[in-house]
Amino acid sequence: MITQRQNDILNLIVELFTQTHEPVGSKALQRTIDSSSATIRNDMAKLEKLGLLEKAHTSSGRMPSPAGFKYFVEHSLRLDSIDEQDIYHVIKAFDFEAFKLEDMLQKASHILSEMTGYTSVILDVEPARQRLTGFDVVQLSNHDALAVMTLDESKPVTVQFAIPRNFLTRDLIAFKAIVEERLLDGSVMDIHYKLRTEIPQIVQKYFVTTDNVLQLFDYVFSELFLETVFVAGKVNSLTYSDLSTYQFLDNEQQVAISLRQSLKEGEMASVQVADSQEAALADVSVLTHKFLIPYRGFGLLSLIGPIDMDYRRSVSLVNIIGKVLAAKLGDYYRYLNSNHYEVH
């Protein structure tokens, strides 16, 4: 455990270093720390011995080590902090008209990436927690059709498929009827379970040959089990990490799994400093924050960047963007649920 003065010195070194990326000497600290230069140097030496500070090769100053950044995050960083100076810029960046949910989530991801210079990832509500609230089949021709699904009464998902060769029109009607009777209004988690248990038995009552029918069920509903992921600033990862992080960001489903695992049960926010179980994120910092998607649940807003990032500003931007995004989504869903009259 370090003393209060040593804690203040570490915090100030972190703050100054993240702003200038230059080693910090005792003279710079004296402007804020009410102690002699010798006392400050002695405390800096103790912090270095504890592994919280590192010597710079080209200067007599010190800079935070990865362990020092981690100590700062765990003991001094407020995860709910907001810098009022950033509020106006974020609100201004959100001044655009969105025509669908994906537009807002993608825009929010770009805003966070552009304002930090790092990599931003936004996830929609976890698939397992969404509900199938609408289903229809539209026959496009004699050989193909379109499954139109609605999640949470607002999110459309469409899947085009080739009609099995032995299918007649009445078979498509039966397919739709099974979905409406057994799967509609259920959660995606329930659907995944029923496709392996109930549906194979039900299909036998309606169809003579069941193999291609079960394959059709799997094909149509497989889309529901995938995370909706919006990545921005992927190229930025090359400035603070190696190629493995850049390549990892291409695997959006694995990215989603790793980011969800960074939050413990019941947590609304977390900061990992070189502490991810994912090898591609082991040498970077990951800020993760839940934000409200009204009427549906929680999305996830994440920022991936260097260990020596400006944590206070990054946390502030994540919090502000999460709040502004939730407000925009609230307006969007209220509009969808309201009576809409066409004006001539």
UniProtKB/Swiss-Prot annotation:
- Chain ranges passing through the membrane: none
One Gene Ontology BP term is:
negative regulation of DNA-templated transcription
Record's keyword terms, sorted: Repressor, Stress response, Transcription, Transcription regulation
| Domain of life where this protein originates | Bacteria
**Classification via InterPro entries:** GAF-like_dom_sf, HrcA, HrcA_C, WH-like_DNA-bd_sf, WH_DNA-bd_sf, WHTH_HrcA_DNA-bd, WHTH_transcript_rep_HrcA_IDD
Pfam families from the entry? Answer: HrcA, HrcA_DNA-bdg
Q: Which GO terms describe its molecular function?
A: DNA binding
Q: Which PANTHER family match?
A: HEAT-INDUCIBLE TRANSCRIPTION REPRESSOR HRCA (PTHR34824:SF1)
Family assignment from sequence similarity: Belongs to the HrcA family.
Entry function: Negative regulator of class I heat shock genes (grpE-dnaK-dnaJ and groELS operons). Prevents heat-shock induction of these operons.
Q: Which NCBIfam families match?
A: hrcA
Q: What is this protein called?
A: Heat-inducible transcription repressor HrcA
| Species of origin | Streptococcus agalactiae serotype V (strain ATCC BAA-611 / 2603 V/R)
